[in-house]
Amino acid sequence: MKLEGRIAAVTGGSAGIGRGIAEAYLAEGASVAVMARNVEKAEKMLAEVGAGDRLIFIQGDAMDQASVEGFVDQTAAHFGRVDILINNAGGAGDLQPTISLSDESFDECMKWNVYSTFWGTRRALKYMTEQSWGRIINISSMEGKHGKPVLTAYTTAKHAINGMTKSVAREVGTQGITVNAICPGLVITDI
């Protein structure tokens, strides 16, 4: 198993892409902490996956700084460290033409996508720099390379994540830490 003994933390990990990532990491031998808002969905996942003490759920909201930072800290407290962070939580939010998009909707999309990625990354780096090893994987989108009508906030957020990924990768690359973004196309999920 390629990830035997590694500790992974996945935001938005109880459904969709995040659940798939969590299950793949478990299959490769990692222990995994998932953060999600929906307790019922997370408990269902825990029961269905049945990974025993290698899978834990920590309730949290990606739009709340204390939740995201607390998730990373609780993962480290439970498993002893954080080796891999997958910043997966996020979404498109309010799909409106730019002229109709409210400041509140734009800000919410930034918090859900950009700020949550920043908060998780910054906190995980605290642990990863101490151990001189880590992997941060940011789930972005093809929209982070292009643009689409009515996705102004989402496209802006994903462009920001791609820029953040490149900057942080250059900051910490000499310390045994890699930072990458994955830019999937449209994925139909149950979130």
Language model segments and positions:
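Conserved glycine-rich cofactor-binding loop
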Residues: 7, 14-16
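The beta1-alpha1 cofactor-binding region of Rossmann-like NAD(H)/NADP(H)-dependent oxidoreductases
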Residues: 39, 59-71, 103
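Substrate-binding pocket helix/loop in short-chain dehydrogenase/reductase
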Residues: 96-98, 102-110, 136
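Active-site loop-to-helix junction immediately N-terminal to the catalytic Tyr of the SDR YXXXK motif
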Residues: 97, 101, 147-155, 167, ...
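Active-site helix of classical SDR
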Residues: 121, 157, 165
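Residue(s) in the substrate-gating loop at a strand-loop-helix junction
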Residues: 141
